[in-house]
């Protein structure tokens, strides 16, 4: 799916497009969504009555996931929890599918906590980003997260597992189930795929032990859409900027008013562009690409053309995109800056209490 079609579908499925032609197209997709929802409900029931089996790892498992396709900030939340656990002295292993990597489907160690053993194009964006930015964090990839966890037990001896994007991975038993919900559109338009953005019906939210409401505005309250389940409020903030390759990080504020090309291949590139504008950057050109995009020669050439043709002083992208550009040897490489995304949890007590209660058992 190209970026413009993906953007249109996301607007349609999230309920932000409501014209008559849009509603007509949506109505054609609804029967498929009803069938998809029925299949997902049946699958959940089969796991609940144990006709489909979940397997348990010998160490506690903390799952971080969501109900919708696209970005709700899973990787920043996973990174935040990983850093907290490491600071508490635990040996932490992240279990990731390795989506988008050339070795997707293989079970392998991405990082042993000291050495990153793969490139981003092999293991995927998120495992490489976590491995390369969090010292001491172990990362194992595999479509079967139980097998990945057992490999980690054999080779790395972790104290606790973090299951990245694991809400629907019911084959693995988890001890703490954390659900992320976008503040503005927690359930999209309410439909499952393909008429909506839901991976499961909204009733699946009841499996959560803790809800983290992401992308909350700085000052507006974020009431929980799931009363009775403990919840936290989180927002994302762009922190320091890091030059691609060599160079020291510097504050985003130093780019205020500067002419920049913004590009990103993430779930919500336009949200990233808007955050750059809020920081005071002058976006003279934008280049939105599909999530998990591969930066081949054609993509690199397009970035170079946009950079020079727009008169931009710099090109700014996300740190997640940047991990796929580290080996870039091009004239424009010295002008590419990586924006670091930081997670701020305003009320962390429900999260830290849940983590401590689990690990002190």
From Swiss-Prot:
Keywords: ATP-binding, Kinase, Lipid A biosynthesis, Lipid biosynthesis, Lipid metabolism, Nucleotide-binding, Transferase
GO biological process, one term: lipopolysaccharide core region biosynthetic process
Disulfide bonds, paired cysteine numbers: none
Single GO molecular function: tetraacyldisaccharide 4'-kinase activity
Catalytic activity reported: a lipid A disaccharide + ATP = a lipid IVA + ADP + H(+)
Pathway where it operates: Glycolipid biosynthesis; lipid IV(A) biosynthesis; lipid IV(A) from (3R)-3-hydroxytetradecanoyl-[acyl-carrier-protein] and UDP-N-acetyl-alpha-D-glucosamine: step 6/6
GO cellular component: plasma membrane
InterPro entries in the record: LpxK, P-loop_NTPase
List of residues binding ATP: 68-75
E.C. designation(s): 2.7.1.130
Pfam families per the UniProt record, alphabetical: LpxK
NCBIfam families: lpxK
Functional note: Transfers the gamma-phosphate of ATP to the 4'-position of a tetraacyldisaccharide 1-phosphate intermediate (termed DS-1-P) to form tetraacyldisaccharide 1,4'-bis-phosphate (lipid IVA).
Family listed: Belongs to the LpxK family.
Name of the protein: Tetraacyldisaccharide 4'-kinase
Gene: lpxK
């Amino acid at each position: 799916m190209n970026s413009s079609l993906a953007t249109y579908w996301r607007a349609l499925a999230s309920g932000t497009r409501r014209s008559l032609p849009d509603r007509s197209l949506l109505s054609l997709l609804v029967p498929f969504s009803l069938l998809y929802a029925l299949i997902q409900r049946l699958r959940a029931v089969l796991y609940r009555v144990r006709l489909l089996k979940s397997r348990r790892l010998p160490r506690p498992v903390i799952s971080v996931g969501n109900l919708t396709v696209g970005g709700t900030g899973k990787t920043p939340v996973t990174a935040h929890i990983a850093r907290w656990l490491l600071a508490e002295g635990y040996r932490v292993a992240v279990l990731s599918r390795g989506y988008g990597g050339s070795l997707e489907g293989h079970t392998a160690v991405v990082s042993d906590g000291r050495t990153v053993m793969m490139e981003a194009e092999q293991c995927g964006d998120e495992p490489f980003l976590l491995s390369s930015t969090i010292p001491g964090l172990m990362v194992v990839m595999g479509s079967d997260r139980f097998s990945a966890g057992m490999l980690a037990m054999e080779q790395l001896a972790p104290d606790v597992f973090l299951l990245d994007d694991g809400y629907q991975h019911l084959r693995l038993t988890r001890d703490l189930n954390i659900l992320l919900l976008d503040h503005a559109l927690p359930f999209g338009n309410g439909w499952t795929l393909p008429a909506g953005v839901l991976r499961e019906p909204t009733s699946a939210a009841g499996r959560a032990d803790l809800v983290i409401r992401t992308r909350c505005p700085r000052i507006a309250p974020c009431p929980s859409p799931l009363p009775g389940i403990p919840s936290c409020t989180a927002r994302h903030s762009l922190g320091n900027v890091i030059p691609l390759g060599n160079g020291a990080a510097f504050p985003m504020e130093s780019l205020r008013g500067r002419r920049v090309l913004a590009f990103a291949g993430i779930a919500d590139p336009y949200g990233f562009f808007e955050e750059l504008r809020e920081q005071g950057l002058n976006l003279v050109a934008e280049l939105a690409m599909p999530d998990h995009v591969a930066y081949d020669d054609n993509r690199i050439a397009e970035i170079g053309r946009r950079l020079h043709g727009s008169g931009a002083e710099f090109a700014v992208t996300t740190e997640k995109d940047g991990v796929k550009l580290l080996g870039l040897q091009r004239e424009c490489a010295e002008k590419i800056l990586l924006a670091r995304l930081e997670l701020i949890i305003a009320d962390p007590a429900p999260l830290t209490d849940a983590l401590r209660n689990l690990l002190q058992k």
